[in-house]
């Protein structure tokens, strides 16, 4: 692979990796939101805490790998042929993409607190309340961090090409 082709691929990688993390956030909202349906209400308090605890072990790798890849690819783009980024005006897009993606981590404490409440079945006999709070936080987080990061990195890649 030529250096030019490698650089073009590097310019695309943040958009590709952030597509995966944004998709995961949307999947979480759609799939986890099913627990809020009235048809599951009789089973939620018994099933949801265990489901979340065991499920979290299965899907945590997406978060552990996905977001650091976003950061790595964003930083690599800012150091590889910086002069090219400057000349195309794409530097700001890579910086903003990195900024918004890192912003996702500002929600970690809140997210972990809400997850702990779900896993402990809090409030007793109505864990749907905790799930609703987590879903709301997840939606806001996706809209103000993941979506803008994805848009910025697409703009960065398009302007750098």
Swiss-Prot record:
Keywords: Glycoprotein, Membrane, Oxidoreductase, Signal, Transmembrane, Transmembrane helix, Virulence. Its EC number is 1.14.-.-. Residues 1-18 form the signal peptide. Glycans are attached at residue 45. It is found in: Membrane. Its main location: membrane. It is a multi-pass membrane protein. The chain crosses the membrane at residues 59-79, 92-112, 139-159. GO terms for cellular component: membrane. Pathway: Mycotoxin biosynthesis. It comes from the Eukaryota. One of its GO terms (molecular function) is oxidoreductase activity. The keyword Membrane applies. Belongs to the epoxidase xenD family. Epoxidase; part of the gene cluster that mediates the biosynthesis of GKK1032, fungal natural products containing a macrocyclic para-cyclophane connected to a decahydrofluorene ring system that show potent antitumor activities. Within the pathway, gkaX functions synergistically with gkaB and gkaZ to form the cyclophane. The pathway begins with the PKS-NRPS gkaA which, with the help of the trans-enoyl reductase gkaC, synthesizes the polyketide-tyrosyl acyl thioester product which can be reductively off-loaded by the terminal reductase (R) domain in gkaA. This is Epoxidase gkaX. It comes from Penicillium citrinum. The gene is gkaX.
């Amino acid at each position: 692979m030529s250096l030019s082709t490698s650089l073009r691929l590097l310019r695309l990688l943040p958009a590709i990796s952030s597509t995966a993390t944004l998709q995961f956030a949307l999947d979480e909202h759609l799939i986890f939101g099913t627990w809020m349906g009235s048809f599951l209400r009789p089973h939620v308090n018994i099933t949801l805490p265990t489901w979340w605890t065991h499920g979290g072990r299965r899907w945590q790798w997406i978060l552990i790998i996905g977001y650091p890849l976003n950061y790595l690819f964003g930083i690599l783009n800012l150091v590889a042929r910086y002069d090219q980024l400057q000349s195309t005006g794409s530097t700001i897009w890579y910086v903003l993409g990195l900024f918004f993606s890192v912003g996702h981590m500002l929600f970690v404490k809140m997210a972990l607190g809400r997850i702990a409440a779900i896993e402990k079945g809090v409030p007793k006999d109505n864990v749907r309340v905790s799930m609703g709070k987590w879903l709301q936080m997840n939606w806001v987080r996706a809209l103000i961090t993941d979506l803008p990061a994805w848009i910025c990195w697409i703009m960065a890649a398009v302007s750098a090409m």
